[in-house]
UniProtKB/Swiss-Prot annotation:
Its EC number is 6.1.1.12. The lineage of its organism: Bacteria, Bacillati, Bacillota, Bacilli, Lactobacillales. It is found in: Cytoplasm. Belongs to the class-II aminoacyl-tRNA synthetase family. Type 1 subfamily. This is Aspartate--tRNA ligase. The gene is aspS.
Amino acid sequence: MKRSMYAGRVREEHIGQEITLKGWVGRRRDLGGLIFIDLRDREGIMQLVINPEKVSAEVMATAESLRSEFVIEVTGQVAAREQANDKLPTGAVELNVTALIVLNTAKTTPFEIKDGIEANDDTRLRYRYLDLRRPEMLENLKLRAKVTHSIRNYLDELEFIDVETPFLSKSTPEGARDYLVPSRVNKGHFYALPQSPQITKQLLMNAGFDRYYQIVKCFRDEDLRGDRQPEFTQVDLETSFLTEQEIQDITEGLIARVMKETKGIEVTLPFPRMKYDDAMALYGSDKPDTRFDMLLQDLTEVVKGVDFKVFSEAPAVKAIVVKGAADNYSRKDIDKMTEVAKQYGAKGLAWVKVVDGELNGPVAKFLTGIQEELTTALALEDKDLVLFVADTLEVANATLGALRGRIAKELGLIDNDKFNFLWVVDWPMFEWSEEEGRYMSAHHPFTLPQEETAHELEGDLAKVRAIAYDIVLNGYELGGGSLRINQKDLQERMFKALGFSTEEANDQFGFLLEAMDYGFPPHGGLAIGLDRFVMLLAGEENIREVIAFPKNNKATDPMTQAPSTVALKQLEELSLQVEEDETNKTN
């Protein structure tokens, strides 16, 4: 029979109606001769009642055979429950079953289909189709669908054009490692899966599309963590003839629309703006979490005269004050934080506690001469804990920024109901890579430098500033964008500053440089990480929770066993040969 409605949508208004439902058996209970079944579908749970006095022996026998995750079809009359269940939207009603058909049986599942399960991540991914039956996973993916629907409607209203760009593109040396695809037709040549549609969307501006968008898969072969996947989705925008502010206004409107339509939250516009240098100085991060205080304090000048060379001779000394937390952290706890500090390049972590108005701790004796000045500078009160890092400015900022976030989580200082958006602007154009031994693009090599610093492309690259902007939410980079270079000579200067020879630039980006000979308009854009945005809206801590079929931290899929080996014939067709792993050679 045709399904009348979803099980999770039956309400009191349907009492007295005969309906047909289809779904999965959640659980079965036998009470006083009656059989109660929780029928589950994507919209929720409906209680079924099978009364032996009102159904045939065949229906009763079928009901007794039901097990969890059997797929069934039931017909019956909606009735009011004697005792309502306020925890369920369907809790005021039940279905008195008159007909029951088993559409399919099921083996015992490797974990219960319910929220809050304790199965490990790989088991969940191995049986992802079962994991996705759980209500919280269904809700996460329904939220994702609502977000993309809201985004499309908003951009369509602003006359953006949805254009698909190629997945088989050219490998470029900047950024993360590419996923490479060998060409069978052009032996020895490789495509790359795009890390973003950056160049193709710029070329669409040269083609006169004016406003482009795409919700698009991108690929990066990089080490994974909770908010990264090898394949991810971004909301990609590009516009012609707009200023930095106009692009940000459009982005803020998009986010405001999504927040209102999916969370019922009215966000305050415009978003705050923070310079990159201020973000690093005050928060120790280029993606500051502004939901709590504990700002970094610069004490370099304050401690210059102390008889403690670690402080007095350090390039920078910075600190954070953990208010009222002296009793929360033992020496053992601080030792653990010291190990964290070392992971960020710090040589150690100094600390004092304020106890009865005096400084206590390993370095307190060196600070007695400046206690009053230190107390004033840091606004110290009894029971405060102060953590110091003496190192380069970059190391001090990064270390204390990491500790700031860790401590805030441990002490419950973060209001998880807050959504604090802000723009980080005035970025450096380049960042030094110790691994590469040279300056690299902080964003990408197509970013427009600020006019007043562009002359440093042939001088001190550390002084070049970009017309770039990142949108940050609760300590996560939600997205980033910039105005782009549209003048050929400036683009060539940029490539040269990055160490490209003329030949290398033409080999890698000759098509883009050629396009700049044909009236390339001023343009700029932005990309928002959809997975990360939905993760934050859903209150999750890992983007796997908002992606239907993600990879694990080893970039593998436990369900399909991807990536896998392939037949020798397939490799031969591609003129490829796989070298045996050294560990296998010795076994």
